[in-house]
Amino acid sequence: MLAALLTLSAVLTAQNRPAIDFWNRRAPGTEYESILEVSGREELGVFLQRARDPRNLRTICEGRLEAIDTAIPTQQQYLKTLLAQPQQSRDFAEIAWTHRSLGQLWAYVGQLGRAAEEFDAAYRIALERQSTDPRLRDALPPLEAMIGVAHLRRGELENCVDNHQAMSCIFPIREQGRHQRTSGSERAMEFFLKHLARQPENLEVRWLLNLAAMTLGRYPDGVPERWRMPAKAFTSEENPGRFDEVAHEAGLHTIGRAGGAAIEDYDGDGRVDIFVSSTDPCASARLYRNAGGGHFEERTEAAGLKEQLGGLNATHTDYNNDGFIDVFVMRGGWEYPMRNSLLRNDGKGN
């Protein structure tokens, strides 16, 4: 059955898992202990069709969507195959790792609750079998950190995105920015403390423990003294002033992924406009025209940007010296190669 499955699609197994440490996402040969990434990028990469034309932005988007549609069901089927083996011949480390890979894939699509469930399943196996398999014993600290990160991100989505308000996720967290839905940060603190009990030298997890407590209004007293960061760690000697979040009122409140921004006067009316790109290969670049009075109106389609998909970064330049500011969009560098774009401005912001 497993052989048939392997002919249908890629499967994340011991033979083809991403070229990183079995449990830790630290690159081989490095000496530092870094926080475990919960993104699923490496895992989804196994399912991406690398042969797609990097010059065709639309087919790259389609390939990513196909990979997402394939990855989770394929891994779930592989897990069923592993669990169908007789109890005495099961590879529990491989079963735990498959739960972990499913958790990463769920994280990739933004389902952090389901991601945490899969990480937790791997963690329970590691706890139960640690005495018989050193791989599972070694898995406990990184899994604890991974579960904590997944829950912290879940809390961020539930409070900073789904329940967004002006003070959401502005660091350091003040009273108005505290989480109203608290289970994410509460569970994160639980697993960060478990991790620190095993690896007290991990400063990144210690930092995240204090951050999680801050989102709940429990810093500093809610953090055990041994792990408590001093208050000066969250303050600055500089005084840059205060910036209020006004994106919603300005017409700029959109939800997307990280990307680039190039702010310039693209239509020559004397007011600066905003061009943004997104690392999501299925999301188009956007152009917001400054309408004056602190308000912006979207002109993405009118500017011919609907098919300008993806973009790690963007910068403005007048490449042809016609006096109109153009935009250069840079892509690729993560999951797959993608072409760049040089967008010529016709002088009307198009």
Go through the PLM ranges and name each one.
Residues 16-89, 93-97, 101, 161, ...:
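N-terminal leader/linker segments that initiate helical-solenoid repeat arrays
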Residues 61-62, 92, 96-97, 104, ...:
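Short coil/linker segments at helix-helix boundaries
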Residues 63-81, 111-125, 181-189, 237:
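Helix-turn-helix repeat elements of alpha-solenoid scaffolds
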Residues 92, 99, 144, 151, ...:
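TPR repeat positional signature
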Residues 221-256, 288-309, 343-350:
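Blade-edge motifs of beta-propeller repeat domains
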Residues 250, 258-268, 289, 311-324, ...:
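Beta-propeller blade termini
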Residues 261, 271-278, 323, 327-332:
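Hydrophobic beta-strand segments that make up the repeating blades of beta-propeller
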Residues 280-282, 333-336:
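Short glycine/acidic-enriched loop and turn motifs that connect beta-strands
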